[in-house]
Amino acid sequence: MRLTIRTPARSIGAALGAGILAAACGGSASLETPTATPTATATTTAAVTTASAGAWTLTDKSKATIRVREQLVGVSLPSDAVLTATGAKGSFELNADGTFTSGSMITFDLTTLSSDERDRDNFIKNDTLQVRQFPTAQFVPTKTSGLTLPLAASGTFSFTLTGNMTIRGKTKEVTFDVTAKRDGGDLTATATANPSWKFGDFGMTAPSVPFRVLSVTDEIRAVIDIVATGPTS
């Protein structure tokens, strides 16, 4: 995503080179003049610089959403528990070959996880995720597939994103199906985990709450919504 699509983006760009400019001019003194005119020489050299054209920075509108199927006591049909985490931070940038630069990372504050049920939120955060010890989740993007680079200055793009997700101190390589839209220096993207995750992938067990939850399906469906700003071209 130059998603920098980290265009990660995190659209998504590559490093630009800079050139060296040099110019010189000179003059000489006349022998017929009693007082010699000093020779004047001026030289101008521009410094060599390398500017990044692909760095995208997340805004506070970015979020992560997880869905888990649960069967509640006294409810005839199962339903989805939907929890959302905000407090996203980070940046990302793509290389010309579709990989990401070192330092590309997205971090979500798991202490902000919330749903429509406070008791569920507290159980998930304190017992399942153990947010006091592991308050954040980190995603380090490593490569894209199916993304044409360099990314056009505007348009929509679909591709696969691969990276390393760390939750509760355990890291797993994951893939996302991504749909992104770029409008100059603004980038939005929705990344859906495919395949979905198991609780055991991150050293967790499916939640179990006596007298409240009959069962929880061992499947985590994760979606990351990215809103980022970056280069305009």
Q: Model-predicted segments: where are they?
A:
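Bacterial N-terminal signal peptides that target proteins for export
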Residues: 2-13
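C-terminal motif of bacterial Sec signal peptides marking the signal peptidase cleavage site
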Residues: 21-24
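Low-complexity, acidic/polar, glycine-enriched regions of mature
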Residues: 26-233
